[in-house]
UniProtKB/Swiss-Prot annotation:
Its main location: cytoplasm. It is found in: Cytoplasm. The keyword Cytoplasm applies. The gene is thiI. The lineage of its organism: Archaea, Methanobacteriati, Methanobacteriota, Stenosarchaea group, Methanomicrobia. This is Probable tRNA sulfurtransferase. Transmembrane segments: none annotated. The keyword Flavoprotein does not apply. SUPFAM superfamilies: Adenine nucleotide alpha hydrolases-like, THUMP domain-like. ATP binds at residues 201-202, 285, 307, 316. It is an enzyme of class 2 (transferase).
Amino acid sequence: MQGAFTDNTNNTGSEKETNVVIVRYGELALKSPGVRNWYEKILMKNIAAMLDSKNIPYSLMRREWGRIFIETTDPRAAGAAADVFGVVSTSSALITKPELDSAAETCAFLGKKIIQEGESFAIRARRSGNHSFSSADIGRACGDAVWNMLESEGKHPKVNLGSPDREIFVEMRQNLAYVYLETVKGVGGLPLGTQGKMVVLMSGGLDSPVAAWLMMKRGVMIIPVYCNTSPYAENAAKERAYDCIRQLQTWASGHQFTTYEIPHGPNLRSFIEMCDRKNTCLLCKRMMYREAYEIMKKEGASGIITGSSLGQVASQTAANMHAEIYQLAIPIYHPLIAFDKSEIIDIARKIGTYDISTRSAGSCTAVPERPEVKANYDLIVLEEKRLDIENMVSEALKAAKVLKL
């Protein structure tokens, strides 16, 4: 069932309680009113697309100040919404009237279901809007209701505000109150699509998918580019890269990637045959940047993303990374520049690309035995003068494939 959007609710809570997912967001709330309104609308569309992609039904999606509410009975909804960029946390909750008695009754109902003999509990209450009672009043009323319910069940209630076995949360707003038991941590960041588009050089290894995901988390829609280095790489390398792109697509419901495959083998052959072998990797990367830059302009994007991490491999020295962009007026983003390998692996596991990226796909046979690690910038430019760089870029792009994976 497709849901509907509304900006507020006039529901007074007079109906039977229904299940709802509370969606919280972070830095969106710091934006100016106009920008915030725009971000929230995009976030709601992205959440709706994520729910639809997982066949999770909802009857209504609405927003109030600082919150988005999804009315649904599907237990998967909170987890799905938490995986949408821009969402800080979610909670599956019960709706009730914004009154002490109603909130207390709902807390007692949930407490009866979850609190076992010998377990301690605490009520965590907060409120917004105009009410004749304080958050402390909510806590006392709801705590008393749970205590009395437990005693009526023959249990021995215990309150522990510091480290309880069970917690019941109450969020009292102007028109409705919400009672819930847990919070699902979201991915955070900004809604996908709010920060334009960027090209990402996608190799299929551990690093580039993580770099792409981190920029998606900051609201950037990615355009994956795979430079096919065949015959210097196995076909398994291409399949691995494509599978990583497909996995990243699951984080971008409602946003279809446009993927480019560029034949890069002929250019590599030229570098090997006509230039100093130690510079092959540097020349290769500079060519990839040029090719990606042309796609960036074609797609109306505003930057190029790489998976480079300073010092991680011999070729990723500060000098080499400078040489890779020397005299190239191209905006390059390195989101992993200061990450340890262990941190990159942790994120890869989280986003679902680790098992793909660690599949055996062979190594690039064009890599020299002793690659340059401290490049001479001007020498690299002189190396390129031996080649018809402009024509090499043009021919590669003419043969590029445009894919919807």
